[in-house]
Swiss-Prot record:
The lineage of its organism: Bacteria, Pseudomonadati, Pseudomonadota, Betaproteobacteria, Nitrosomonadales. GO terms for biological process: DNA recombination; DNA repair. The RuvA-RuvB-RuvC complex processes Holliday junction (HJ) DNA during genetic recombination and DNA repair, while the RuvA-RuvB complex plays an important role in the rescue of blocked DNA replication forks via replication fork reversal (RFR). RuvA specifically binds to HJ cruciform DNA, conferring on it an open structure. The RuvB hexamer acts as an ATP-dependent pump, pulling dsDNA into and through the RuvAB complex. HJ branch migration allows RuvC to scan DNA until it finds its consensus sequence, where it cleaves and resolves the cruciform DNA. Pfam families: HHH_5 (PF14520), RuvA_C (PF07499), RuvA_N (PF01330). It is found in: Cytoplasm. Homotetramer. Forms an RuvA(8)-RuvB(12)-Holliday junction (HJ) complex. HJ DNA is sandwiched between 2 RuvA tetramers; dsDNA enters through RuvA and exits via RuvB. An RuvB hexamer assembles on each DNA strand where it exits the tetramer. Each RuvB hexamer is contacted by two RuvA subunits (via domain III) on 2 adjacent RuvB subunits; this complex drives branch migration. In the full resolvosome a probable DNA-RuvA(4)-RuvB(12)-RuvC(2) complex forms which resolves the HJ. Keywords: Cytoplasm, DNA damage, DNA recombination, DNA repair, DNA-binding. The keyword RNA-binding does not apply. This is Holliday junction branch migration complex subunit RuvA. One of its GO terms (molecular function) is ATP binding. Residues 1-64 are annotated as: Domain I. InterPro entries: DNA_helicase_Holl-junc_RuvA_I, Hlx-hairpin-Hlx_DNA-bd_motif, NA-bd_OB-fold, RuvA, RuvA_2-like, RuvA_C, RuvA_C_sf.
Length: 195
């Protein structure tokens, strides 16, 4: 599986981008939320990716942040929501917007997205309701987990049974320069208070 792509941005044609990694060009589908934040042609870019295998195609989907990729994966597990619809949702709504929609059970905002009818919107809200806790707010889509300390803390929280959304939220609350052990302890305290 390809989880991350880092390389030179060669082309941008919505919704596709072409990224050169050591002489190999990867064509990646991205939501408009990611497309709008891409650097210029010829600059370095890093995308969190999801590798999608179908009978007729192998596709890469790219996201500027980990929370966007996590949400894309949750969306595409819902019956009736394929990869293209998942991209359309993330193109029209930020991670936090979708979180608020799920918490408030506001299906009308979802039906404004192309490809989402009333029944699909209601199914999406039903499926995501148990996965998104109202006590936990997701980090802004502009934040990215980049440091090795953050990754070590995320891995530890994952090993302790926390899902990606909870772990990313907790790490996003930590102060800069925290050690791995202190970060794990602080994250556990935050997560226990949020439940």
């Amino acid at each position: 599986m390809i989880g991350r792509i880092a390389g030179l941005l060669l082309e941008k044609h919505p919704p596709l981008v072409l990224v050169d990694v050591n002489g190999i060009g990867y064509e990646i589908d991205v939501p408009m939320s990611t497309f709008c934040r891409l650097p210029g042609i010829g600059e370095q870019v890093t995308l969190h990716t999801h590798f999608w295998v179908r009978e007729d195609a192998h596709l890469l989907f790219g996201f500027m942040t980990e929370p966007e990729r996590v949400l894309f994966r949750q969306l595409t597990k819902i019956s009736g929501i394929g990869a293209r619809t998942g991209l359309a949702i993330l193109s029209g709504l930020s991670v936090n917007d979708l979180h608020q929609i799920v918490v408030s059970q506001d299906s009308t905002r979802l039906t404004r997205i192309p490809g989402i009818g009333k029944k699909t919107a209601e199914r999406l809200l039903l499926e995501l309701r148990d996965k998104i806790s109202p006590a936990i707010t997701l980090p802004e889509t502009g934040t990215a987990m980049a440091s090795s300390t953050d990754k070590d803390i995320l891995n530890a929280l994952s090993a302790l049974g926390y899902n990606d959304r909870e772990a990313n939220w907790a790490v996003g609350q930590l102060s800069e320069g925290v050690t791995v052990s202190d970060g794990i302890m602080q994250s556990l305290r935050l997560l226990s208070k949020a439940k």
